[in-house]
Amino acid sequence: MASEEENDDNFQEEEEAQEDNAPAAELSNDSDAPLKPNNDEDDDYDPEDSRRKKKGKKRKTRKGEEKGRKKKKRKKNESEEDSDFVQHDEEVEYPSTSKRGRKRKEEKQAAKEKESASSGMPSVEDVCSAFSVCNVEIEYSEEELQSLTTYKAFMHHVRPILQKENPKIAAPKLVMLVAAKWREFCESNPHIQQEGGAAGSGGSAGQARSVTGDEPEEPRSSRSSRNEKPDDIYEEAVEEEEEEEEEEKKPRRKRSGRGKKGRRPSGKVPTLKIKLLGKRKRDSSDEEQDASGASERDSDLEFERMLQKSDDSADEKEAPVSSKADNSAPAAQDDGSGAPVVRKKAKTKIGNKFKKKNKLKKTKNFPEGEDGEHEHQDYCEVCQQGGEIILCDTCPRAYHLVCLEPELDEPPEGKWSCPHCEADGGAAEEEDDDEHQEFCRVCKDGGELLCCDSCPSAYHTFCLNPPLDTIPDGDWRCPRCSCPPLTGKAEKIITWRWAQRSNDDGPSTSKGSKNSNSRVREYFIKWHNMSYWHCEWVPEVQLDVHHPLMIRSFQRKYDMEEPPKFEESLDEADTRYKRIQRHKDKVGMKANDDAEVLEERFYKNGVKPEWLIVQRVINHRTARDGSTMYLVKWRELPYDKSTWEEEGDDIQGLRQAIDYYQDLRAVCTSETTQSRSKKSKKGRKSKLKVEDDEDRPVKHYTPPPEKPTTDLKKKYEDQPAFLEGTGMQLHPYQIEGINWLRYSWGQGIDTILADEMGLGKTIQTVTFLYSLYKEGHCRGPFLVAVPLSTLVNWEREFELWAPDFYCITYIGDKDSRAVIRENELSFEEGAIRGSKVSRLRTTQYKFNVLLTSYELISMDAACLGSIDWAVLVVDEAHRLKSNQSKFFRILNSYTIAYKLLLTGTPLQNNLEELFHLLNFLSRDKFNDLQAFQGEFADVSKEEQVKRLHEMLGPHMLRRLKTDVLKNMPSKSEFIVRVELSAMQKKFYKFILTKNYEALNSKSGGGSCSLINIMMDLKKCCNHPYLFPSAAEEATTAAGGLYEINSLTKAAGKLVLLSKMLKQLKAQNHRVLIFSQMTKMLDILEDFLEGEQYKYERIDGGITGTLRQEAIDRFNAPGAQQFVFLLSTRAGGLGINLATADTVIIYDSDWNPHNDIQAFSRAHRIGQANKVMIYRFVTRNSVEERVTQVAKRKMMLTHLVVRPGMGGKGANFTKQELDDILRFGTEDLFKEDDKEEAIHYDDKAVAELLDRTNRGIEEKESWANEYLSSFKVASYATKEEEEEEETEIIKQDAENSDPAYWVKLLRHHYEQHQEDVGRSLGKGKRVRKQVNYTDGGVVAADTTRDDSNWQDNGSEYNSEYSAGSDEDGGDDDFDDQNGAERKAKRRLERRDDRPLPPLLARVGGNIEVLGFNARQRKSFLNAIMRYGMPPQDAFNSQWLVRDLRGKSERNFKAYVSLFMRHLCEPGADNAETFADGVPREGLSRQHVLTRIGVMSLIRKKVQEFEHINGYYSMPELILKPCEPVRSALKQDVAALEAPPTGGNVDKSATTSNSVTPATSAAPSPAPASEKGEDKDKDSEKEKDKTSAEKSEVKQEQEAEEDKKPGDVKQENPVEEAAGDTKPSDAEVKTEVAKTEPKEETKDPEVKEEPKTEEKEKEKVDDKKPIPPTTVIDDDDDDVMIVKEDGELEKPSASSPKDQKAVAAATSAATGATGKGAEDSLEVLKRKFMFNIADGGFTELHTLWLNEEKAAVPGREYEIWHRRHDYWLLAGIVTHGYGRWQDIQNDIRFAIINEPFKMDVGKGNFLEIKNKFLARRFKLLEQALVIEEQLRRAAYLNLAQDPSHPAMSLNARFAEVECLAESHQHLSKESLAGNKPANAVLHKVLNQLEELLSDMKSDVSRLPATLARIPPVAQRLQMSERSILSRLAATAGNASNAAQLMAQFPAGFQGTTLPAFTSGPAGNFANFRPQFSVPGQLSNNSGV
C-alpha cells in the first residue's frame, strides 16, 4: 500500500519500531462464520483461531545497536497443525506522528470491513430468513453517515434498535445480523467507501497500514510507528463486540482508547503485544503467500515482486543462508508502494543474561536523548499548552495537574503513569521486554545473539554447528524449528552414539559441538507399537524438540561423554550364541544369515538377540486393501510388547511362525489349509527373505493322535522316541519316575513327586505331560502353578523337552494378561469379553499348557477357574500346607481332573499340614482331620512311620540324591568360627549397653524387643558398616565405594573371606556367597569391586528374566565371573549354579532349612567337583548360639511327626532369646585375652580349603546329617572339643541367672548414662537406675557390690544336708577335716557347674536336663505318690534313691521344667512337648489330678495336725514327743521377740499358698466309683475339673501371698522355721504351715474359692493374740473350728441354698463336737476332724452311725472319724495308695485296730485293703466337694428360686414343715379327739397334694438337670482360663518379688529368665511344704 511515509524507509534502521496498542476482544465461534471472507485478501484470518492467531513482528535495530525485544508467549493452539507452524508477516514499519490515534485505526477497520463486504458473506435478508428474526429498516442521517465510520460505533448505534424488535434473539445471531447490517451500511456509505479505496490501493490488509493524505503530522518527538494489520483490527472489533454481548464475562483483553476512563490499571502487557512463539512454525510461508494475493493483482505490486525475486537470487549467491533453516517467506516483502525494497538481515540482539526486567510499563514511542535519557514533550497532552507539567514515567507525554481527571492538587510521589498509559496497556510494553531469550540456548551466555523468527530461542553464531560466519539474510529459523518431525512416537531411548555430521547438514545445537564440531549425538529409538526390528538412530536435536522430557531423563541417568558399552561380540563359546543358533535353526535360518549386520545394527546397541526372534504369531487381522497383519509375540518380551507386523516384512522367522499359526488355527477351528491366504504383499522380496523361503526346514503344526497309542501300564524301558528329537537324555531314575506318574494317572491316583532338591522334578513333570500329549491320552489343558522366581526356568524346560507343546506363560501386568486372554486362550471370537478378567465362554482351547504363578491363580480366578483342567501341577507344593491360605481355597475351587504336587520337602513333620496337603490332593479320601490325627495317637514313632508309609505309598514318590546318584561328587560342610574385629566388639558392647533396660526388665524384655536386639547383634557380626553411624564415618575411595582396606579390616569375616578368595581364585574354583541381608550384599559388592573380582548378584529385587540372565552368564563356559552373590531366601529356589563348587554361607539363616536349600544350588545334577560348604559363625556371639539353637530345633522337628509345630524350625521362645543374647557376652566384656583368639594365617586357610578334608561326614539320613553338622574343624580354634559320647540335641535356657544382665551390664550402663548426662551439660542429675524386680535377691540388698552379688548366686545352697549328696558322699564326711573340706569343695563345684543341656544323647539314650529315662520315671512315680515335691525334698522321704545323685539346683530346674510341661496346652497323644522334650506317655490330666488330690489331703491333715498330734495311739509310745514339743516352744518363744513386717523371704509360706491352692484338684475317675453317693452325676462333673481347680487355686494363692497384710503374723514363725535344726524341722514346719495358711485366707483376696469362713475367723481371732505356745494355738484352733462348724451354713450356701445342705452341715458340726469330746476323755488330748461336704456324700451319715457304735472302750475298734483322719495322715506320709506301709507304721497303728477280729481270715489283707480304698475314695469325694463349696461361697453362687430343682426343694421343705408341725394331731386323733381327727385329715390331704406335685416335678427333673451348666462352668474353672491365668505374668514388681520370696534364697538363679513373673513363678503354688505327721521338717538355705 502506498502512503506518504514511504520516503521514510531509509530511516527505518534508525527508528524504533513500535507495535500498536489496539485492544482486542474475544470473538465467539458463532459470529465467525458469516464474517469469514472468501477472497485471498483475508486468508490470514481464521475464525477458528481468532483468539489464538496473532501476528508477531520483527523489530529493527537502531543506531547500530541490534537490540531485540522478547515476544510474549501466546496460548498453544488446539490444532496440532497450528501448534507446529507460525505465521510471519512483512516486517516493514513506518514512523508516524504522535497524533495518529484512534481515528486512523477506525479508518483501517472500515477499509477492512469494506473489503470483506464483497466477499460473498450472507446478506441481511439471508441472516433474517436463516434465524427467523425480524429485519429493521434503519434510516441514517448525514451526520450519522459521517460519524458511523467504524464497526464499533455502528454496532453501538444499531444493536439496541435490532434488539428492541427482537427481544428474545440469541447473542450470536444478533452479532451476525449486525455484521450483515454493517456490510450493507459500508456499501451505501460514501464516507467509508473513500477511506476503503485508499486502504484498498495499498494492497494486502495484513502488510501495512493506510494513512490518508489529509491527516496532519505531529511533531517528530511524539511520532509513533503503528503498523497495524486490518485483520487484527477487525478481529479486535469483533472481539470487543462479543465482549460487550457477554457483559465482559471473559475480560481477557483490555480495550484501549483515549476516551475510556473507567479501566483499572494492569501490570500485564496487553494481549495485542504478544508475539508468536515457535509453535506454529510451518504455515507461515503459505499464509504469507495467501495474504499477498490481493496485492499481486495490482500491477505495481507484481513489478515490485519481480524486482524482489531478482534481488533474492543475487543475494542467495552471496549470503550462505541454510536452505533448511530458511523455510519462511522472503526476508523482506515490498510495502505495496512499487518502490524497491531494501534487503534486511535476520534479527539480532545484544543479550544480557543477568538483566532484570523493569516491572513498570513503558511505551514504545519513547525517544531517547543523546545520553540515553528519555525525551518528553514540553506541552500538555490535553490542552497542548506549556507551563508547569508533570511527566509520565512510561511514555513521552506530559500533563498539567488541572488537566487530569480527576484533578491533582500536588504531583504524585514515585513513578507515575499517565491516564493514557494506564488505559492503553498495549502501548506500555517495556522497551527491552523482548520475547527472545537474553542468552544463548547452547552456552547460556549473553552477547550478540541471533534470534529465531519462529521461537524465543537465541544463539551465538559460533555456537551453531556448523557455525555461521555472517548473519543470514531474511527470516532465520533455528535448528530446533527447522528439524523435521519424527516418523513415529518414541517409546524409549536404548542407547546413544557420536555421529559425524555431514557437510550439507544445517546448523545444529548439539552440546558436544564445542568439544568436537564434527560430532553430534544420535539416539537409538524404540518406536511405540513397533518391534525392535524398526529401531532407528535419531539426531539429538530432533529428539530434544519432540521428546524433551525423555531425553532429559536419559541424560540424567547415563554418562553423556562416553556411549555405553553392551555385551561383547558373540563368540562360539558363548551359551547365548548357542541359544540364538538353536532358535535360528528352529525358524530355518542359515547360521550366518546377516549375523554381522544384526550384530552391528542391534546387538551392539543394547537390543538382545531374543527380542528380534519371533516366538509365535498369536493373532491376525485383514485390512480393507486385503493385506494381512499378524500380531507377533517376541521372545523374552511381555505380551503387551507384541506388535502388528505385515506378512511381507523382512523379519527372520516370521514366515514360518505365520505358517505354524495358520496350521494350528485350521486344526482348532476345523478349517482346511486351503482356506489359508497364500498371497503375499506385492513388491520385491528381500534377498534375505528369498533365501529364508528356499532353505528353511518346513516345520508345521503336527496335531496329536486322536486315540491313545500306548498302554499306560507298560513301562518305558528306554527313553521314549518322541524325546529323541530334543537331543536330551533322561537319567534312569527319571524314566522310573515318569513310569510311576503315568501309571498313577492311568489309575486316577493323585500324586506327590517328592524327590530331593536337584534331581530334576521339573524335567520329569514336563516329560510326563508331554507323553500324555504325544501318545494321545490327553491334549490338556494342563495348568502349572510355580513360584514366580522359577517361572522362566519352567518355560525354558517346556520349550526344550516338549517342543510341540503350545505353552503360554500367563504372567505380567494387567495389560499383558489381557493380551493373553484375548489372543492366546482360544481362536473363537468373543471367548473373552473385553479386557477385564471374566469367564472363558468356550471349550475349544488354543493352548496345551498354561504356566502361571501362585498369585495369579488367585487374582485371575474368574478366568482360569472357568477352564476344565485336565492336570494341575503345583511346584513347591508346601504352599498348600495350610487350608486357610487364599491359594489353597481358590485352587481347591478349580475344576481339575488330576493333581500332581512337586515338593522337595514333603513332610514338614506336622500331621495337620500333611493332612491339608493330602486333603487338597484327594478330598474324598482325606476329609477328617480329627480321625487322621487319631490314627497316630498313642503309637510309637516306628508305628507312625509305618502307617504313614502305608497311607502315602500310592500317592508319593521320594528319592534322595544319595539313593540315585551314587557317582555324584560329595559335599563337605565346615563350621568356620571367626573372631570379632575391634570395631565389631565396640559396637557389640554398645548395643548391649544401650539396650540394658530392655534386657533387664522385670519380664526379661518382650520377645519383640529381644529379637530387635538380636538382629542388631547379627548385623554387627556381619559388618559394622551395616549401621549408619559406622557407614558415615567410613573412608570411601573414588567412585563412592568403601576403601577396601578399612572395609576388610572392619569385619573378621571379611578378613578371612579375602584370604580364602585369593587362594580359591588361584585354584580356579568358583564361589557362591549367601547372606540374609541385601545390605550385606551391597557391602560385599564393594568388597569384590575393591578386590577386582567379577561377580553376579541375585536378591529379592531381581526377578524373572534378569535372574535367569545372570544365571546364564555365570554358567556360561569360560565365564569370567568368579563370585555369585545371593540372598539366602531369594537364591534358594529354582536356581542351578552347578558350575560353582564352593559355597560360603556368610551368615546363617534363622531357619537352617533355607541354608540347606541354598547350598543345594551347587550340589545338584551337573556338579563335577566336590562341593565345599563353609558356614561363617562369629565366635562367642549371638550368631553362634542362634546357629546351635536353630539347628537343634530343626532336628527336633525331624524326631517325630507331631501336631502343633510348624516346619520353620526357628520360632524361639523368650527364654531362648534371652539365652541366645547372653551367649559369649561374659567373655566379651572381659579384658582382651588374645590366647583363645582365632587367627587364620595362609597355612590355616590352605588347610581349610583342602578338598581332601572330609568335614562333616556324609549320612544316609538327612536328619542324621543335620544332627552331626555342628562339629568344629580342629584347626579353627584352640579351645577344647566337646565330648564325643555326649551329643547335645538341645541346650536348655533354664540355666540362666535373672541377675545376669545386672551383673554384666549395670556398671557399663550407669557409666553410659553418666556420659550422656555430661554431654547434656548442666541439668538434673541422672539418678542411678535400680531394678527392684530381679527375683527378690537383688532387691534384698541393693547396696552390695557386684562381686558379692555374683558370689551370692552360687552359695545359696551350700549348706544342705548330706542326705542329698551323691552315693558315697557319707564316706567323705566321715573323714578328717581335710577330707570334709575337700568334699565341701566338691559339692560347691558340682553346684556351680552349669546345668546339663536340655536334650542330649548319651549312649544312644535321650537325657533331659541330665535325667535319664529311669530317673524321669522315678520322678514321675514320686509325683504320683506324694504330689508336688516340697522345698526341702532333699531332707524328706520324697527324694527316692534314683534322684539322690542330682544337685538341688539341677533337681529344682527339672521340677520347674516338669511343671511347665504339665501346664502346656496340647494333645496328650503328641510325642513331644513344644520344646522338643519327649512326652513319654505322660497323661497331663492324671498327673494334675493326683497333685491336686494330694494337696487337698495334705491341707486337711495340716489343718488338724497341731490338735491331733503326730501319733494315733500315743499310749503305745513311752514318751510321745514331749522333748520335741518343748524344743519347739523354746524356739518359738525365742523368735517371737523381733517380729518383722513387710516383704520377707517366705520360704515357709509356700505351704500357705499351696495348701489351699492345690486343694482344688479332686480325684479323677475313681471318685465316681462310689455308688453310695446320692449326687453321683454332679460329682462326675466336679471330677472332670479337678486338675483345673488345683491350678486356679495355685494362682489365687500366689496372689494372696502378694498381700502385705497377710505376712504380719507369719514372720515370727517363718524365722523360726528358718533357723531350726534338721532334727526338729518337721515339728516347726507344722506350726509354720498352719498359721500362715490360715492368715492367707484374707477376705479381701479376689478369686479365692478355697477359703472357708472358719479360716477367716481364725485369722481375725489370731491377730490380737500373738501365739505364745503351740498349746495355746491348738486351743484357739479347736475353739475356732467349733465355732466355724456352726458358721459353715452361710459358707456352704447362700441364704437361698438348699436346706439339706444346711442340715447336713449342722449335723457335721455336731458330730465334730462329739468326736472331740470323746477323744479328750479317752486320750486326755483333743481330737478334731471334719470335712464340710455339705451333705453331698454319705460321710457324715456314716460318721453319725459309727460314733454311736463307738462307745467308750471301743473307740479304736469301730472305724469312724478318728480313723479317717489318721488314714489321710498316713497317705501324706507314705504316699497315695500305700496301704501296707501305712499299716506297718506305728504312728498310724489305730488303722489296724478295726481289723484285729479278721486277722485269722484267709483273705484278710484283701478285705483290709479294699475297705481302705473304698473309704479313701469317700473321703476324697468329700474333700473335692468341700473345695467346690468353698469356691461357690466365694463366688456367692445362688440357685435361681424359680429353678425346678429349687421348687422341688421348697415343696420338700413344705412337706417336712407340715409333717413336723402337725405331729401332735396324730396322737390326739388316736386319743379320740374328733376335731383333731378332722384337722388331721385336712393335713393329710395337703400332704398328698404336695407329694403328688413333687412326683410330677421329679419326672421332669432329669431333663432339667441335663440342662444345668457343668460345675466347671458355673465355678468359672474352664481348663483354658485356668491355664492362661496360671501362665500369666505377675502384675507388678512387688508382686514378682513376693512371688519369688516363696522359694529358697538361691532358687532364682536356677530358673528360667524372668521366672519371677513368668509362668514358672506360679508353678510354685503346686508345692506345699512337705510335712509328715510325727516328724519335724527343715527348710535348708533359708
Curated annotation (Swiss-Prot):
Domain Helicase ATP-binding, chain residue ranges per copy: 742-924
Top-level class of the enzyme under EC nomenclature: hydrolase
Compositional bias (Low complexity): 1547-1568, 1700-1711
Positions contributing to ATP binding: 755-762
Modified residues (Phosphoserine): 79, 83, 201, 204, 210, 221, 284-285, 292, 295, 299, 310, 313, 1691, 1694
Keywords: ATP-binding, Chromosome, DNA-binding, Hydrolase, Metal-binding, Nucleotide-binding, Nucleus, Phosphoprotein, Repeat, Repressor, Transcription, Transcription regulation, Zinc, Zinc-finger
Compartment(s) of residence: Nucleus; Chromosome
Matches recorded under InterPro entries: CHD_C2, CHD_II_SANT-like, CHD_N, Chromo-like_dom_sf, Chromo/chromo_shadow_dom, Chromo_domain, DNA/RNA_helicase_DEAH_CS, DUF1087
GO biological process, alphabetically ordered: chromatin remodeling; chromosome condensation; chromosome organization; mitotic sister chromatid cohesion; negative regulation of DNA-templated transcription; negative regulation of transcription by RNA polymerase II; nucleosome organization; regulation of transcription by RNA polymerase II
Domain Helicase C-terminal, first and last residues per copy: 1056-1218
Activity control note: ATPase activity is stimulated by binding to either DNA or nucleosomes.
Motif DEAH box positions after renumbering to this chain: 875-878
Protein name: Chromodomain-helicase-DNA-binding protein Mi-2 homolog
The organism of origin for this protein: Drosophila melanogaster
Gene from which this protein is expressed: Mi-2
